[in-house]
Curated annotation (Swiss-Prot):
An annotated GO BP: DNA recombination
InterPro entries (UniProt xref): HTH-like_dom, Integrase_cat-core, RNaseH-like_sf, RNaseH_sf, Transpos_IS3, Transposase_IS3/IS150/IS904
Reported function: Involved in the transposition of the insertion sequence.
Coiled-coil zones: none
Keywords: DNA recombination, DNA-binding, Transposable element, Transposition
Pfam families: HTH_21, rve, rve_2
Start and end residues of each Integrase catalytic domain: 125-285
Gene Ontology MF terms: DNA binding
Regions that span the bilayer: none
Name recorded for this polypeptide: Transposase for insertion sequence element IS629
Length: 296
């Protein structure tokens, strides 16, 4: 409103314009003084201006998906002492909001007869890294057709240990995600949990799990609670990345997924981990047991 008054004041005068807009002329002059002499503004107003810049930075650095709680927690991690209600107030003024998750579309094709038993029973907890992995995949619509994105997640801290983007739902694509996870972690005795999708209960996949010393586990088909953690990651990925724009092709989705996985593992704050990123939580665990190599 003030820029409009600035533009019209020479033609119509401040008094008549303020009268028409139902504001006091003193309000206009006060705003003018604050704009031209920012150092004379109240301490709260000056701090708000500084906080807005910090809030915008945190929001931008985290893919513009953080809501009030995550922005507030990140500011606290950086040593910026601010009340949550202040962050909420300023984000509302700035028009910033977090991204909400959508619903998962079923992609599972069942092969119940050859599936392994359920070793997890919906207890998605782990006392250490590489004790329990969960796997699932989702789909992404692009201009050139559907592509599919598979994730393997370590339950202890939610670290994504393997992922792959493919133009088909063939078993080889989830096998590629598994190979990446095996190469990165070198696990032994890890429980690998998935749904009863045909890719995960295929002979090739189950044989590779056995060769690597992993213990296969499957939940019931069509029940999201039996693979809740993996489906939660899929939902987060779709909400924070995929649903925010249209995608041209597989390569574009692959690059965006690479960027997101790096952010998720190394910078995204998880409340259950004391508002720390997964990578940091794993390092803290290894430091606590004296494993300096993995804690570094």
């Amino acid at each position: 409103m003030m820029p409009l008054l600035d533009k019209l004041r020479e033609q119509y005068g401040v008094g008549p314009l303020c009268s028409e807009l139902h504001i006091a002329p003193s309000t206009y002059y006060h705003c003018q003084q604050q704009r031209h002499h920012p150092d004379k503004r109240s301490a709260r107003a000056q701090r708000d201006d500084w906080l807005k810049k910090e809030i915008q930075r945190v929001y931008d650095e985290n893919h513009k998906v953080y809501g009030v709680r995550k922005v507030w927690r990140q500011l606290l991690r950086e040593g910026i002492r601010v009340a949550r209600c202040t962050v909420a107030r300023l984000m509302a003024v700035m028009g910033l909001a977090g991204v909400l998750r959508g619903k998962k579309v079923r992609t599972t094709i069942s092969r119940k007869a050859v599936a392994a038993g359920d070793r997890v029973n919906r207890q998605f907890v782990a006392e250490r890294p590489d004790q329990l992995w969960v796997a699932d995949f989702t789909y992404v619509s692009t201009w050139q057709g559907f592509v599919y994105v598979a994730f393997i997640i370590d339950v202890f801290a939610g670290y994504i240990v393997g992922w792959r983007v493919s133009s088909s739902m063939e078993t080889t694509f989830v096998l590629d995600a598994l190979e990446q996870a095996l190469w990165a972690r070198r696990p032994s005795g890890t429980v690998h949990h998935s749904d009863k999708g045909s890719q995960y209960v295929s002979l090739a996949y189950t044989q590779r799990l056995k060769e690597a010393g992993l213990l296969a586990s499957t939940g019931s088909t069509g029940d999201s609670y039996d693979n809740a953690m993996a489906e939660s990651i899929n939902g987060l990925y779709k909400a924070k990345v995929i649903h925010r724009k249209s995608w041209k092709n597989r390569a574009e989705v692959e690059l965006a997924t690479l960027t997101w996985v790096d952010w998720y593992n190394n910078r995204r704050l998880l409340e259950r981990l004391g508002h720390t990123p997964p990578a940091e939580a794993e390092k803290a665990y290894y430091a606590s047991i004296g494993n300096d190599d993995l804690a570094a």
